[in-house]
Amino acid sequence: MTRAMATIPYYDAEAVARATPMPALIAALLRAFASGDYHAPSRLAADMGGASLLVMPAWKGHARVGTKIVTVDPRARPSIQSTYILSDRASGRPIAAIDGAMLTRRRTAAASVLAASRLARPASATLFVIGTGALNAPIVEAYTSAFELKQILVWGRDADKAEAAARAARAQGYPAAAIATVEAGLAAADIVSAATLAVAPLIAGSALRPGMHIDLIGAFRPEMCEADAETFARARVFVDTHQGAMDEAGDLLQAIAAGAIAAAAIEADLAALCSGAHPGRGEDDAAITLFKSVGTAIEDLAAAELVVGNVAP
């Protein structure tokens, strides 16, 4: 026997973008991480032979539960595609279906900037974005919402795509330019944000300067890597979640295996930074800070609640 299911609203990519202005989204993530009310187990990550399948559930007390299904395939365009289902926890009934790809892009960028607001020098003026994929534009949008940037540099393996990304940023009023090498970007940047599917280091620790902040978004599988072991050895290291980092953060795990850093040297996670349990950078202007993220379903749920306009408990 079949039975008709009540229709639930679907929020497409455009609706998600409209509903998640970066200042509001960053604030929503801050509340979620500081509250301790949001919970997420380790995500299921499956290798599909050159591609990845991720299933990410989370819940907020007895109020909400959400699940995101993601595929990541470097051969696909866009490379990240997903759907998010937000449900009422008490009844189990779905409340909304949401474009998970846009939700992921925006909450990922917002989480990085939330961390940077505690770890980067407030006067940081130059952002260097490594990667020209779907995260490039949200990263630029998020950082410009929180820092008074005078220069945004973009690098990608494909120079034409880097120029296109910079041109798109300029069209939005941002002071962006493509550059030819990673080395040139590292030499100029106050903040470096890498969002790639790299399996070999792009960032060399030897090129880092005192006071920089490094934001590593890619390398969400153990075999992936955006920064070399020396990068971690020279930096004060922070993560989005300890469990996620130790399970999946490729470049961090490789640095630990190489003896460049001990797991115990990780200073804090995003919850500690948001709750005030850890002061973040503090007054240490000379420190190199590093935020390694692999993503957490807590971010998805907080963002989904913002999308449907229901952030109350």
Where are these regions (language model features)?
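N-terminal ligand-binding/catalytic initiation module
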Residues: 1-105, 113, 120-123, 298-301, ...
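Generic secondary-structure signature for well-ordered alpha-helical cores
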Residues: 21-22, 30-38, 74, 117-121, ...
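Residue-level signal for well-ordered, solvent-exposed loop/turn and beta-edge residues enriched
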Residues: 91-93, 160, 260
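Glycine-rich adenosine-cofactor-binding loop
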Residues: 112, 123-146, 152-161
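Short alpha-helix adjacent to the SAM-binding motif of class I
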Residues: 163-168
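Rossmann-like adenosine-cofactor binding region
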Residues: 172-257
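Adenosine-phosphate binding glycine-rich loop
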Residues: 225-313
